From Swiss-Prot:
Its EC number is 3.5.1.5. Transmembrane segments: none annotated. It comes from Parasynechococcus marenigrum (strain WH8102). Belongs to the metallo-dependent hydrolases superfamily. Urease alpha subunit family. This is Urease subunit alpha. Residues 131-569 form the Urease domain. GO terms for molecular function: nickel cation binding; urease activity. Substrate binds at H221. The active site is at H322. It is found in: Cytoplasm. GO terms for biological process: urea catabolic process. NCBIfam families: PRK13206.1, PRK13207.1, urease_alph. Ni(2+) 1 binds at H136, H138, K219, D362.
């Protein structure tokens, strides 16, 4: 006779199942489990008196015959493709199974074999996401890496050489020497990394040199002169060498207006940074570029979401980052031209519509490297409060909104930069870069971060305590972040030309170098759940933003979730 268990007792034991709903931290966002891949009555769970024991949920299968290295049990997966409950199997640092784990000799429906060589991570009662991807990094200091990892970000792409004046302002690693040094520095950092060369040149030779030296992309920045000539030259090199181009356009409209930039791009793929404009770009209407099919538009987190403090903090940040002098009126006017409440408010709504596709940090250069995921779900919360449910959602859940927003910090930046075959989602064959969250801390403080199949970061108590949980409990680096375990768990993204140039051997790199691929064929239509193409216009006098003729405006938030409630010091 089957044993019956209440839904509440089941959720407390094995985590939520199909039809159960979970609130995310202190937001108003609710997810609902769409499907459960585990088998009722044959669930696996580790512990005294539990299932993963010899002859029960653990088989005799050796690793060589198919048993996985690690199983994450009963996890609630949140990814762009859906919200499901499943066991997840890891082997050789990659995801090899999403389904039902256990012993096929004693259990039904097993797709992930647990053996004597299998480690267990308890995922029941936790949310599992892919590691976050931040593609707007100013590599100003190496301490950013730990801060990003502590927030659930496992891949960082951008440019810089340290706290040089150029790096403080622009995400460029200029020239072969600096690219080589940064690739060597990456050896000791427990995340995936990729570096952008400086794209500001009107002839191709110096750009090609940087790509061969290991740049995985090129960055055009107005502080180095983003003119129509440099845009055309940079994109021409990128098309030949298959790397992405990122652009921060001409705020002052010195070399042309947004229409001139669009003309210079000539329909070629380009990733536009802080597309709203407060981070830089044609004033006041760079935001309209998000309606172009070849443009991959992103935001940076200082304007995510629009709050009562957003405008006030921006001016001083901008003056510092771009080496401006508050005593020079022209510098102040330059800064003030970028900060517009109307376009920042519209940015919130364009994200909710799926017209802006990516969110990144702009680390230490107006943005905060440890707040990408937090700011993303604060924006989702604010939009639910102000705009209500999306048409695709129901009164029961916010599943479509949640999958749309998680895509902005996982799969979409991966697609934009040609690394989606390796990272960006929870799919078999991809690198096991995974983040486990307690629902009450979702988006603000990961419980566990797995990098290439090894735990690299976790909430951990006093190391001198008798058990792992006594306080002070805080995030700390784990064994996967140390020694020779680090290199095989991480990837360094470079160009195919750099691989042909044998850059890994020339620089004596231990980490696996991986070439970015198909960066020139990706268009906005390829970006998951964020491919809307509204016709956007900006009133030049009032700065009001319209999409398909409709005014986009919203009030600033007075208070946000995922904030001081979690960060009292």
């Amino acid at each position: 006779m089957p044993y019956r268990i209440s839904r509440q007792a089941y959720a407390e034991t094995y985590g939520p199942t199909t039809g159960d709903r979970v609130r995310l931290a202190d937001t108003d966002l609710i997810l609902e489990v769409e499907k459960d891949y585990t088998v009722y009555g044959d669930e696996v769970k580790f512990g005294g008196g539990k299932v993963i024991r010899d002859g029960m949920g653990q088989s005799q299968t050796p690793r060589t015959e198919g048993a996985v290295d690690t199983v994450i049990t009963n996890a609630l997966i949140l990814d762009w493709w859906g919200i499901v409950k499943a066991d997840v199997g890891l082997k050789d640092g990659r995801i090899v199974g999403i389904g039902k784990a256990g012993n096929p000799d004693t259990q039904q429906g097993v797709t992930i074999v647990v053996g004597p060589g299998t480690e267990a991570i308890a995922g029941e009662g936790h949310i599992l996401t892919a590691g976050g991807i931040d593609t707007h990094i100013h590599f100003i200091c190496p301490q950013q890496i730990e801060t990003a990892l502590a927030s659930g970000v496992t891949t960082l792409m951008g440019g810089g050489t340290g706290p040089a004046t150029g790096t403080n302002a622009t995400t460029c690693t200029p020239g072969a020497f600096h690219i080589g040094r940064m690739l060597q520095a990456a050896e000791g950092l427990p995340v995936n990394l990729g570096f952008f060369g400086k794209g500001n040149a009107s002839t191709p030779e110096a750009l090609e040199e940087q790509v061969r030296a290991g740049a995985c992309g090129l960055k055009l920045h107005e502080d180095w002169g983003t003119t129509p000539a440099t845009i055309d030259a940079c994109l021409s090199v990128a098309d030949r060498m298959d790397v992405q181009v990122c652009i921060h356009t001409d705020t002052l409209n010195e070399a042309g207006f947004v229409e001139d930039t669009i003309a210079a791009i000539k329909g070629r793929t380009i990733h536009t940074f802080h597309t709203e404009g407060a981070g830089g770009g044609h004033a006041p209407d760079i935001i309209k570029i998000c309606g172009e099919a070849n443009v991959l538009p992103s935001s940076t987190n200082p304007t995510r979401p629009y709050t009562r403090n957003t405008l006030e903090e921006h001016l001083d940040m901008l003056m510092v980052c771009h080496h401006l002098d508050p005593k020079i009126p022209e510098d102040v006017a330059f800064a003030e031209s970028r900060i517009r409440r109307e376009t920042i408010a519209a940015e919130d709504i364009l994200h909710d519509l799926g017209a802006f596709s990516i969110i990144a940090s702009d680390s230490q250069a107006m943005g905060r490297v440890g707040e990408v995921i937090t700011r993303t779900f604060q924006t989702a919360h604010k939009m639910k409060v102000q705009r209500g449910a999306l048409p695709e959602d129901s009164a029961r859940n916010d599943n479509h909104r949640l999958t749309r927003y998680i895509a902005k910090v996982t799969i979409n930046p991966a697609l934009a930069h040609g690394i989606s075959s390796e990272v960006g989602s929870i799919e078999t064959g991809k690198l096991a870069d995974l983040v486990l969250w307690k629902p009450g801390f979702f988006g603000i403080r990961p419980e566990l971060v797995v990098k290439g199949g090894s735990i690299v970061w976790a909430q951990m108590g006093d190391a001198n305590a008798s058990i792992p949980t006594p306080g002070p409990v805080h995030g700390r680096p784990m064994f996967g972040a140390f020694g020779k375990a680090l290199a095989p768990s991480c990837l360094t993204f470079v160009s195919e030309a750099a691989m042909d140039n044998d850059i890994q051997s020339k620089l004596r790199l231990d980490r696996t170098c991986m070439a970015v691929k198909e960066t020139r064929s990706v268009g906005k239509s390829a970006l998951k759940l964020n491919a809307a193409l509204p016709k956007v216009s900006v009133d030049p006098q009032t700065y009001e933003v319209f999409a398909d003729g409709e005014l986009l405006t919203c009030e600033p938030a007075e208070v946000l979730p995922l904030a001081q409630r979690y960060l009292l010091l």
